[in-house]
């Protein structure tokens, strides 16, 4: 009989231990699973949209253009210029400016159309004396909506900023339009690192005789 009680006690202890171990293991598994579920259920936070900013001198892609029609001097042409730019008139020259960029329009009587040779031999030497650190002149003939035009590209320093004292290295595009004894020089300028290819094409393509 003593043997039977001992055996039963062993069986009971063994069963209880197994139940406790099973509960302990089951509890551990639930905690682990619960932890993983909470972690995977956390929604990813969306990244904020980057703020768009243009390099200094870049004309915005959404820039609006308006038609300039001169009312004095030679008035036989029109050209589109960026809306909102400040305008200055001095003699036969009208300038539109905004920060680091400018559109300069100069009219003059001319007995002959400008050529590669005339711009190279006459205009370039004049600009060397007028533009600080004038450099890299290149004369070509290009086509715009108004027809064939002589284009002079070059670089030079801007005027010193009266507030900051800074000087900007500028790139220039000078288009010489001609018709029936009248020449209109359209000069577009801005910082050399600015990407204004499209805006300047819009302006130069908009030139029209009337």
Residue map of PLM features:
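N-terminal targeting sequences that direct proteins away from the cytosol to non-cytosolic compartments
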Residues: 2-101, 180, 187-210
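Short amphipathic beta-strand/extended segments with alternating polar/hydrophobic composition
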Residues: 79-81, 106-107, 164-166
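Sec-exported extracytoplasmic/periplasmic mature domains
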Residues: 86, 125-132, 157, 205-209
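A short acidic-to-branched-hydrophobic micro-motif
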Residues: 97-122
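Short, isolated positions in well-ordered beta-strands
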Residues: 103, 149-150, 184
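Solvent-exposed loop/turn segments at secondary-structure junctions
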Residues: 111-113, 158-159, 183, 190-194
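Extracytoplasmic/secreted proteins, especially bacterial periplasmic and envelope-associated proteins
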Residues: 118, 122, 126, 199-202
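Signature of long, low-cysteine stretches enriched in small and polar/charged residues
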Residues: 128-177
């Amino acid at each position: 009989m003593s043997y039977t009680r001992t055996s039963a006690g062993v069986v009971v202890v063994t069963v209880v231990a197994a139940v406790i171990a099973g509960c302990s293991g089951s509890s551990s598994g639930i905690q682990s699973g619960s932890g993983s579920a909470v972690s995977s259920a956390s929604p990813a936070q969306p990244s904020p949209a980057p703020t768009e900013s243009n390099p200094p001198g870049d004309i915005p892609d959404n820039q609006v253009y308006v038609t300039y029609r001169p009312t004095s001097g030679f008035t036989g042409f029109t050209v589109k210029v960026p809306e909102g730019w400040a305008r200055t008139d001095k003699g036969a020259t009208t300038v539109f400016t905004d920060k680091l960029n400018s559109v300069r329009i100069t009219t003059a009587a001319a007995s002959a159309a400008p050529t590669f040779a005339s711009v190279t031999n006459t205009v370039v030497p004049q600009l060397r004396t007028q533009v600080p650190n004038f450099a890299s002149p290149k004369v070509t003939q290009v086509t715009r909506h108004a027809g064939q035009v002589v284009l002079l590209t070059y670089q030079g320093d801007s005027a010193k900023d009266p507030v900051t004292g800074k000087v900007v290295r500028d790139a220039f595009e000078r288009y010489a339009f001609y018709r029936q004894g009248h020449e209109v020089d359209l000069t577009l300028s801005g910082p050399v690192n600015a990407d204004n290819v499209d805006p300047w094409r819009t302006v130069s393509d908009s030139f029209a005789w009337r």
